[in-house]
């Protein structure tokens, strides 16, 4: 594993990063050196490389923010793909806003760090850099950051320092919160392609028959019922990547609440519309306000980061349940 990781680091440093500089030069025009007033660390979600799902991006972002705090470096966030983040989230205690027109793209006056190979040992991320640096990263390395710098940062606390819902998003949160009430648990499932939704890359195959799909859906609904029995008189927020499952659980005799809208994976979809973005943000903010959060898993399903990290935002108890 370490040997493979070292190879990926080498590819990042010797191939991906120079290629990104060449691509930027073609897009922006040639500039050898540009001076600036500050030299921030900028986390990039710009669609120029794959970024992963919502919480892959947030995991990487929080890691780089923690490092910037530890090193005393300004931190900014350039999130424009597949939507502009500032439509839905705004700075809370720390101003991370920056426009790409304000960024430094002089060939010799900025660095980019594409850090696919840093998951095991993120040593390249720890370096204090004197020039503006654009980071591409998708992992939670906060424990390693704390160990390296002697800090005690908490993921949810850092998230809350950075973000709060915009007035636009808050209107939807207030509406759906009023519908579900205050007394609820949250249950999340991630089937990916198993039920035939085809909203994901080919990480896992679609089940081969309708009977297999029906059996998996029935088993998942029974798992929801078992959890419900542990929480009498409590509503259940259901969040899932499968519209097939959502339509089936609506038919079950359970007090479930489902945020209206369609689910898409923000990296594989290529683009999302406003209603899909609202559903994603509302799902994870409502999850963060639940009494407890559960993630259901069965062989072939994906152990999603979405519910676990949403729970961290609200400092809510989280449990994986295998069925």
Predicted features and spans:
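A short glycine/serine-rich beta->alpha loop
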Residues: 47-52, 272-273, 292, 296-297
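Residue-level detector of anion-binding/catalytic polar loops
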Residues: 74, 255, 292
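A donor-sugar binding/catalytic signature common to diverse glycosyltransferases
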Residues: 62, 278-323
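Secretory-pathway glycan-assembly enzymes, especially type II membrane glycosyltransferases
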Residues: 13-209, 214
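Structural motif
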Residues: 184-185, 235, 292
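Short, aromatic/basic amphipathic alpha-helical patches
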Residues: 88-97, 101, 244-255, 307-312
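Catalytic donor nucleotide-activated moiety binding site of glycosyltransferases and closely related
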Residues: 188-196, 218-272
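Acidic carboxylate-rich catalytic motifs and surrounding loops in phosphoryl-/glycosyl-chemistry enzymes
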Residues: 75-82, 234, 238-243, 297, ...
